[in-house]
Amino acid sequence: MSRLNVLYATDTNYAPHMAASIYSLLEHNSSFEKINIYVIDDSISPEVKEKLCTMLSEFNNAEIIFYPFEKLQPKLKIKETWFAMVGYARWMLSEITEEDKILYIDCDTIVNGSLEELWNTDISDCIVAGVQDNPALFALEAVGMNRNDRYINSGVMLINLKTWREQSIEEKIIQMIKEHNGFVMHHDQGIINGVCKNSIKILHPKYNTMSQFFLLKAKQIKSLYDINNYYTQEELDEAVSNPVIVHYINKFYGRPWFDYCSHPMRNLYIEYLKKTPFEVKLKKGKQKTSVRIRKFVFEHSPFFIYALSERILNIRRKVKAKRQ
């Protein structure tokens, strides 16, 4: 029996975005006989849960399982901000399911194709597989990595739960949080990279097509972040032209549920949100001044000027991080 196990985490406010992601996933993956959708439930209202269950009833191969966030808090045994606690709780996976493999997906995504090839990826020789991200060097060093290590974005991850349990990854996560006095650079993403750094598989970028892939060329990303190992331009082109999962990271474009969003695949999100039981109501707002300035520099200056400004910003971020 072909069974797909997927994990999301949300509260009531983010549930409509998760619903759009789930609907797109189910619409493109009818080939699976069973799809288990696990949701870490951070006080989702009964009304919203009912809407989600009603939506899933349209698909005869899907089941949604809510797991209360409150049950995971005691296991963390740390004092932290709400944001970080929810993020870290995602990795208490042995509490949530007894399956041997699970696919974690962020709520701010749309699935645009079959997940069969991704799900069937051989991860027997690693703990986690994901798409490479490009943090600044100080962010890598903050979690015990260096420029030669390949750091992944935690928005889409295929996780080997069998090895996860055998290597006591959850205990290592808690230990790392304690060693960093509750603050780990990039929160849950930094944690997963720091703990699993010697057991990470890199996936094709089409499985987590992030905003920077639409903006920057491969050689620009390598230059900007001083990366030794990265995707080819052909791989990035394929990810942009035929993404399997679109990840609406809040970079230059903004989130697709804001009226100012300029993401080239924003309409795909709107299309799937309309198929859910939730109202399509774009939020009014304005991008942060700092983002607008960076965007202006990127669009109206030679790339080396933009790169210089980003390096200056990274120095400021590094100083700020050391104060925390």
Where do the PLM segments sit?
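Conserved nucleotide-sugar donor-binding
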Residues: 156-168
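Active-site-proximal specificity loops/subdomain of glycosyltransferases
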Residues: 48-49, 55-95
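Short, acidic, metal-binding catalytic loop of nucleotide-sugar glycosyltransferases
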Residues: 24-33
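N-proximal low-complexity "stem/linker" segments adjacent to membrane-targeting elements
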Residues: 1-23
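A conserved acidic beta->alpha catalytic loop
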Residues: 43-47
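Short internal beta-strands
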Residues: 35-42, 130
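GT-A fold catalytic core of metal-dependent nucleotide-sugar glycosyltransferases
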Residues: 66-72, 86-136, 151, 156-159
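A glycosyltransferase accessory/donor-loop signature
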Residues: 1-4, 10, 166-324
